[in-house]
């Protein structure tokens, strides 16, 4: 019998559960899936910005800065930071021409 359908009945003046052995493979699998789902949901809510940024942009770190002068690199970093600071609730992607 599934844990979802177990029935509580009074037994010897106490409340107890009348259910079959809970080592049923289906019950164990459902419990494991339920626990994993709960853990993944909690992690998703805690790190939703990081998760969605990762899935949207992948592992891209941005354009290559090889051969670009340091002053232009610093200007690009400032633009990126100001874009993130301007609107913290949405992701802003700036691409240089």
Swiss-Prot record:
UniProt key word Transmembrane: yes
Residues the record marks as site: Essential for channel activity, possibly by being protonated during channel activation, and by forming the channel gate and the selective filter: 37
Keywords in alphabetical order: Disulfide bond, Glycoprotein, Host cell membrane, Host membrane, Host-virus interaction, Hydrogen ion transport, Inhibition of host autophagy by virus, Ion channel, Ion transport, Lipoprotein, Membrane, Palmitate, Phosphoprotein, Signal-anchor, Transmembrane, Transmembrane helix, Transport, Viral ion channel, Virion
Biased composition (Basic and acidic residues): 71-80
Major place of residence: virion
GO cellular component annotations of the record: host cell plasma membrane; membrane; virion membrane
Subcellular localization(s) per the UniProt record: Virion membrane; Host apical cell membrane
Residues recorded as bearing Phosphoserine in the entry: 64, 82, 93
InterPro entries in UniProt: Flu_M2
A Pfam family that the UniProt record links to this protein: Flu_M2
Positions on the Virion surface side per record topology: 1-22
Control of this protein's activity: The M2 protein from most influenza A strains is inhibited by amantadine and rimantadine, resulting in viral uncoating incapacity. Emergence of amantadine-resistant variants is usually rapid.
Task performed by this protein: Forms a proton-selective ion channel that is necessary for the efficient release of the viral genome during virus entry. After attaching to the cell surface, the virion enters the cell by endocytosis. Acidification of the endosome triggers M2 ion channel activity.
Protein name, per record: Matrix protein 2
